[in-house]
Amino acid sequence: MAKKYFGTDGVRGEVGQFPITPDFVLKLGYAAGQVLVQHDTDQKPTVLIGKDTRISGYMLEAALVAGFTAAGVNVVQTGPLPTPGVAYLTRALRLSAGVMISASHNAYSDNGIKFFAEGGVKLSDEVELEIEAKIDGEMKTQPSARLGRARRISGADDRYIEFCKSTFPSHSDLRGLKLVVDTANGAGYGVAPKVFHELGAQVVSIGNEPNGYNINEKCGATYTKTLQAAVLQHEADYGIALDGDGDRLMMVDKNGQVYDGDSLIYVIAKARAREGINIGGVVGTVMTNMAMEIALKEQGVDFCRAKVGDRYVLEQLNQRGWLIGGEASGHILCMDKHNTGDGIISALQVLAALQTLNQDLATVCADWQPYPQTMINVRIQKGQQWQEASKDVLAEVEKELEGKGRVVLRASGTEPVVRVMVEARQADWAREGAERIAAAIGGI
C-alpha cells in the first residue's frame, strides 16, 4: 500500500504548507501516540523529541507534545540535538520512540518530522502505515488521569558527546591537530566542537551561531566554500562540515580540497582492512563512482549497490551483516559504532583511519580518481514508453563499456524527467554514451 504522508525520510515540506502545519503535526503526534499506546500495553510510553535550530521548531514541537500527551504518552524534550543523537538517546534511555524535528540540509523555510522506533532505528513501513491510518480519524483525548506529561531533560548533550568520544580509539587522541568545524548553524552547533576539543584537537568553530533563519545558509556540508576558506585562513589540518541535522559529513584538507562521502568511506574501509577487521563489505548506491568500487576490491573489500537513499543503504547493510556504507552526499554508516548515519562519529572514524594508515587524506584518496560522468535530464511525456524506446541503444552502450564504465537510468519521482548518467574511464566515452541514450529516449 502506498503511503499518503510519509516520504523516504519521514514527513517533510514547506512550513505553513500542508503537511508542515501545526494542526496536522498535532494529529500526527496524536496518531503516533495512539500506535505507541496500543503497542506498549504494560506501561505508559515515553517519547524523546529533539530538533534542529529552525525558528519553526518551537511551533512544531509544541504541536507534537500536545498530540502525544493527548494520546496518553509521556514526552521528554532535549532542545537542539543532532538526529543521530536523538537515535542514540532513544536507545540508551530505553524509550518507546524518538522524534526529530528537522528538514536536514534544506533551507530554514522547510521543516520535517522523523520518527525512530524503540532501539533508535527508523520506523518500519508497516508502522508508518499504521500511523497514517489513524491520522485522519477523530481525536479523542484521553481522560485526565491518563494524559501524558512533558518535561525538558538536562544533560542530553553531554551524554551524546561522551557516546561520540567513545567511538574513537581509547589508545589515541587528536592532540596536535587543528580542525575547523562547520556545524551549518544547525543541530550540532552545541556538541560537535566539544567532541573534537575534548579529544585534544585545537578547534576553530564556524557556522555555530544559529538564529532560527541561517541554518545551512552558505555553510555546512552542502556549501563547503566557507569551510575551505576558513581552513586556508587558519592554516588548519582539516575542515569538518556537518549539515543542518548533523547526519552528513564532508571534509576539507589543508590545501582546501573537498572530500565527499565516497572518498571518506574509502578511507575508513581501507584502514579497517589494514587492521584486519572484517567489515564484510561496503554498501554504496547506484550513484557511487565505479572507480571507488574497483579501488575497494583492490583492497580486498567487497562492494554492492543499493538504491539512492541512506535508508536503502542501511537495509542492505542489515541484510548482509556488513559494517560500512553510505553515499557521496555525506551520509556514512559505521554499523559497529552507531545504527544510523552520524556526521561527528564518521569524522572521528576518518581521523582514526588516517592515524592507522599514517597518511593524510590526499595521499590515501590518491589510490583512485573518480571516473568522469555525464548526466543528462530528458523531459518525457506522461505515459511515454521510454524504457522500450531506449532498450536497444542502452544494451549497446552497456556492452561497449563493460568493465570500464556503467549506465544508470532513473525516472524522477517529482517531475516528468528521466535522468541519464553514464560514467566511464574516459570522459568522451561517457559523454557519447549519455547522448546516444538520451536521443533514443526521445523526450519532448
Swiss-Prot record:
Cofactor binding note from Swiss-Prot or TrEMBL: Binds 1 Mg(2+) ion per subunit.
S-S bridge residues: none
Sites where the protein binds Mg(2+): S104, D243, D245, D247
One Gene Ontology CC term in the entry: cytosol
Active site: S104
Family: Belongs to the phosphohexose mutase family.
E.C. no: 5.4.2.10
GO molecular function, one term: phosphomannomutase activity
Protein name (database record): Phosphoglucosamine mutase
Catalyses which reaction(s): alpha-D-glucosamine 1-phosphate = D-glucosamine 6-phosphate
This protein's record includes keyword Magnesium: yes
Domain of life of the native organism: Bacteria
Modified residues (Phosphoserine): S104
Enzyme class: isomerase
Organism: Neisseria meningitidis serogroup B (strain ATCC BAA-335 / MC58)
